[in-house]
């Protein structure tokens, strides 16, 4: 017997883009129990559009923009045992995508999350969206266990997501998927990447990231380390993350954003430490195995430079 499935689409101020996401969700052959539009306090009539044009879609309307944490409200409101979570600019590419995601969960009974392959507007792998600890040139077409959650292009087991606490609201955006991944792994769950489900991300891959990315990713790297890692591991994780981010920020002309991120990452340390839950030794052993095929820091920097990822 198949599990029940909901589709939850996150939106903020992109009414016309949301329309396309809802249409791709409606086109699924798998009998989903519901489609939810989770709106982050939009003022562009997104909610009105959904209610007029998609009366079968359930609206979860938030008063304010709370960033990625709005997904928590969507998953909590969902009726399905599995919740497909998509951003408004992500499109399911075939009518069988949900059915394929369900099949991946059946193959991996310990999986809490199934991450999808993300394609760019040109239909090729979106290398900017590749967050897994594997070389995309070697692994993009293979299914494997990973150590990351792709927030806007994945499916989760609702109970596991909620039990792990969902996305920590102070992150707003940036590294919240890594933080949740660590907490799910620490609870004994698996995280899977599959090329069986391919979604298209409509963001133009050549678009230059704003300074906000360098700020939030730097700030949030501190909080991920403080919330999850033991001291030695925290220092190691931060050293690599900050080295890569500092280089990319300086190269892009956003050194000040990086420094603000360092300042506010340290300033937010008390709140992060208040929610601290250090990973167990068993989880560190799992992480060493999962990261065993990760390219070196030098290769990752080289890739970012060559492909201008951030």
Model-derived segments and spans:
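Short, flexible, basic/aromatic active-site loop/helix in glycosyltransferases
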Residues: 116, 130-147
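Glycine-rich, basic loop-to-helix element that forms the pyrophosphate-binding segment
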Residues: 61-78, 94
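A conserved acidic beta->alpha catalytic loop
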Residues: 24, 39-47, 91
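Short aromatic/hydrophobic "clamp" motif used to bind/position activated sugar donors
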Residues: 83
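A short, conserved alpha-helix in the catalytic core of glycosyltransferases
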Residues: 148-156, 160-165, 170-198
């Amino acid at each position: 017997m198949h599990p029940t499935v909901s589709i939850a689409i996150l939106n903020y101020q992109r009414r016309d883009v949301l329309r396309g996401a809802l249409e791709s969700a409606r086109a699924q052959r798998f009998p989903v129990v519901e489609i939810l539009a989770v709106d982050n306090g939009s003022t562009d009539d997104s909610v009105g559009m959904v209610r007029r044009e998609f009366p079968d879609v359930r609206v979860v309307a938030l008063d304010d923009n709370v960033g990625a944490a709005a997904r928590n409200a969507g998953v909590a409101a969902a009726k399905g045992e599995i919740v497909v979570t998509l951003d408004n600019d992500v499109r399911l590419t075939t009518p069988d995508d949900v059915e394929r995601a369900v099949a991946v969960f059946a193959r991996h009974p310990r999986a809490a999350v199934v991450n999808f392959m993300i394609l760019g507007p040109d239909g090729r792998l979106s290398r900017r969206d590749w967050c897994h600890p594997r070389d995309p040139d070697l692994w993009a077409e293979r299914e494997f266990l990973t150590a990351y959650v792709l927030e806007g292009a994945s499916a989760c087991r609702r109970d596991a997501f909620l039990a792990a606490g969902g996305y920590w609201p102070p992150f707003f955006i940036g590294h919240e998927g890594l933080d949740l991944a660590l907490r799910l792994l620490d609870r004994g769950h698996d995280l899977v990447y599959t090329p069986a489900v391919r979604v298209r991300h409509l963001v133009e891959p050549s678009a230059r990231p704003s300074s906000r990315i360098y700020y939030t990713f730097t700030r949030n790297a501190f909080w991920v380390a403080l919330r999850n890692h033991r001291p030695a591991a925290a220092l190691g994780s931060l050293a690599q993350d900050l080295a890569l981010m500092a280089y990319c920020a300086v190269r892009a002309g956003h050194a000040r954003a990086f420094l603000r991120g360092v300042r506010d990452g340290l300033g937010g340390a008390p709140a992060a430490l208040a929610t601290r839950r250090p990973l167990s030794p068993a989880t560190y052993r799992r992480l060493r195995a999962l990261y065993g095929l990760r390219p070196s820091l030098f290769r990752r920097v080289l890739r970012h430079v060559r492909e201008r990822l951030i």
